[in-house]
């Protein structure tokens, strides 16, 4: 489906400046998204799962708004790379409301690797 196809373009280390609020105050907007997927249940409930090493302010909500726009054909399925490259908040989709957003888990450190890394997963549930 369109949203899952577009979600694959979010995977990797990118500058997600377009997916955070203006004047965010962060030194770096580069983040790693290790997985992004969209699932639609039979009752039309939409699940958007995003996993990464950390998220910017409203990043998951803006990703969700952008993917919903793509699913509704308000944006092209191949628009994610140009949005990322632009670094322009206005180029991305709307910020989805916080209701339904759930931080599922956080894991610190990677056992056996000697690396200290935070991995978090957020899930956004949207009902019709």
Where are these regions (language model features)?
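Structured-RNA-binding interfaces characteristic of tRNA pseudouridine synthases
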Residues: 1-128
